Amino acid sequence: ILGAGSGTRMNSKLPKQYILIKDKPIIFHTIEKFSHFDEIIVVINKKHISFFEKHLNDSGHKNKIKLVFGGKTRIESVLNGLKYIDENSNVAIHDAVRPLISKVMIDKLISSVKNNCVVPGIKLKDSARVFENGKAISINREKIIKIQTPQCFHAKDIKDAYSNLQDFSLTDDASVFEMNGGKIEVVEGEEYNIKVTTPLDLEIVKINYEKL
């Protein structure tokens, strides 16, 4: 679970992953969704350790959690987390600020892993255009999928992909896997599995948390 980001777009003094929903930080709501896993590796910013430890004992999953410090970039944080993964296991890499993911979806994704990468995605509902050379070019929205997390792999495969990584501008693990020759399978995701990035996202998550 990747929770080392600073979340500057949230305009909050408190890092967004530690904002409370029903008296519990977002990151611990997310951890709860993976409570049936054998081990939960949580990657956080070293500067945030006091925020994390404040709620760790109350989580009920202290014995399952392996706490790891993140790097300067997402890629570095993933690499730090992968060091502690058994190569013979399957791994789900998830954003700490996607607390509405369901356990059903997590299990569906992780059980579908073979020699591939399995990711959730949802189709685009709005019209889309690409801005190129000063022009707005219309594109077929049926060909566009918004990719979510968790992104699931056989641990050795994603470790190998990261060890061969050359393009450090990539923004998700599936892209790293694909650049190493891996195949990606997209499973229909969940509309409410949104990433909390802005104050509006936070309000949407709060509203939906009461319903789910």
Q: Which residue stretches match the model-derived regions?
A:
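Acidic helix N-cap motif at the loop->helix transition within catalytic regions
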Residues: 50-55
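Short beta-strand-to-loop acidic/aromatic patch adjacent to the donor-nucleotide binding site
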Residues: 88-98
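Residue-level signal for inorganic ion chemistry
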Residues: 1, 27, 81, 94-95, ...
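Residues at the starts of beta-strands that form the adenosine-phosphate
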Residues: 38-40, 64, 90, 116, ...
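N-terminal glycine-rich phosphate-binding loop and ensuing alpha1 helix
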Residues: 1-49
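Short phosphate-binding loop-to-helix
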Residues: 57-90, 166
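Conserved core of the sugar-phosphate nucleotidyltransferase
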Residues: 100-187
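Hydrophobic helical membrane-anchoring modules
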Residues: 193-212
